[in-house]
């Protein structure tokens, strides 16, 4: 009975290790797939400062690579928004037409449509968490007013509002990716963000998305070559580096779960070893009797294996 209980304990511990790690790997893959919706395979940002002008032969070289699916410019900033009298903060991300055509975010639209232009009217898609907080509805006619302090004008005590830049966009749709993204992100045309931030052709980053056939080796090759061509003035980050703290936390959690379950299995193994040791000590006189009758060590082992349950 002791041996059976010990064996069952070992089986349960091993099964728990396999099941829990499998479930965790599933969640890990799900989170990575969701994050890939809003994060590119590679992101080019300046080493110093917030914006740059994406020009030069390097960008032509990137565009010509067969493993590159799309390359788009983005301009991102924390802004103040107002919608029907409700105020709040948001992360406004201006994107170009390539993002509008190629982004997989349209698969996560929960209301309305993924559209950034309707004729000359600028539109925006908003995270469901932010939309819930601000009561934003793509079916309403109200626009979203976006404000940001002017970079070029000084604050006037007589008229402080003159130092605030403002634009207006209309909500076209709501998306839901994950809680952290949904509660703060809104996407709008990059030309409206450049107007708000008083930039001409400057962007905060260039997002590069690879084809489905591109593997990790190809991604690392591109990252290394782009970094070499652009030099120290720019950083080229993969998805892990873009969310280093999140992925490190997931890796540490997985390692911690693995170590805890391995520790449990080791304890169960010692329990089995102790149980068998006690069983042999208890049966040592029976073993001597069997040996006196001519039983070999092999036969005695078989007796313990067959009758030890």
Describe the role of every protein-language-model region.
Residues 139-233:
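Basic-flanked hydrophobic alpha-helices used for secretion and membrane insertion
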Residues 22-91, 97-120:
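Hydrophobic, regular-secondary-structure patches
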Residues 1-4, 212-270, 279-281:
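Peri-transmembrane interface segments
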């Amino acid at each position: 009975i002791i041996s059976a209980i010990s064996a069952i304990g070992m089986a349960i511990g091993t099964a728990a290790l396999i099941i829990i790690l499998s479930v965790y790997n599933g969640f890990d893959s799900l989170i990575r797939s969701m994050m890939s919706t809003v994060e590119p395979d590679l992101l080019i940002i300046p080493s110093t400062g917030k914006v740059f002008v994406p020009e030069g032969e390097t960008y032509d070289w990137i565009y010509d690579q067969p493993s590159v699916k799309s390359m788009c410019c983005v301009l991102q900033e924390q802004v103040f928004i107002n919608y029907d009298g409700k105020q709040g903060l948001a992360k406004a991300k201006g994107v170009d037409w390539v993002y509008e055509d190629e982004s997989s975010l349209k698969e996560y639209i929960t209301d309305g449509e993924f559209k950034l232009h309707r004729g000359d009217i600028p539109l925006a898609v908003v995270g469901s968490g932010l939309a819930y907080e601000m009561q934003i509805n793509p079916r309403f006619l109200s626009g979203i007013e976006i404000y940001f302090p002017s970079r070029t004008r000084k604050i006037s005590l007589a008229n402080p509002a003159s130092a605030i830049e403002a634009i207006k966009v209309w909500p076209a749709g709501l998306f839901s990716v994950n809680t952290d993204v949904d509660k703060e992100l809104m996407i709008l045309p990059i030309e409206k963000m450049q107007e708000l931030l008083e930039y001409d052709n400057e962007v905060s980053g260039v997002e590069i998305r690879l084809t489905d056939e591109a593997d990790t080796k190809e991604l690392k090759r591109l990252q290394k070559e782009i970094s070499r061509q652009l030099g120290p003035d720019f950083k080229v980050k993969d998805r892990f580096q873009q969310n280093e703290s999140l992925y490190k936390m997931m890796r540490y959690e997985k390692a911690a779960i693995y170590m805890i379950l391995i520790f449990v299995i080791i304890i169960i193994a010692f329990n089995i070893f102790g149980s068998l040791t006690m069983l042999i000590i208890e049966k040592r006189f029976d073993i001597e009797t069997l040996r006196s009758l001519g039983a070999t060590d092999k036969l005695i082992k078989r007796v313990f294996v067959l009758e030890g349950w």
